[in-house]
């Protein structure tokens, strides 16, 4: 009985996982992210020159760099990946001269509980909609879990078709 109460209390003390950092949230459109980046100098966004179309044609990438535009920021380089005009991955490199891995890990563990998956390279928290990862040396990543799983499923189907084509080619030799 006490154990159940303790677990329930701990669960309510932990915050739900964030869907992004500052005013940039997973699921935002490309234009919404551009507008939010323009208003927040911490990311070092320089406008359209930071936006590129990935070879896949359905994916757009925004890459920011604070080295020239926001040297006092805790952030270094950041990447914002879109699929079907929706933000589905936020990758933030934190400056190791301004912050350390242990401080971020401790803060995240205190706010969101222990990571569900941990190894020497990364710590991962997740729920039904978000995967939040702290990677070494100092990268924080927010991923839309549903979009990620959909893309992984699609890539497995494509690999299977490619494997079948390769097998057919080899059989024809």
Question: Where do the language-model regions lie?
Answer:
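Non-cytosolic coordination micro-motifs
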Residues: 12-56, 89-173
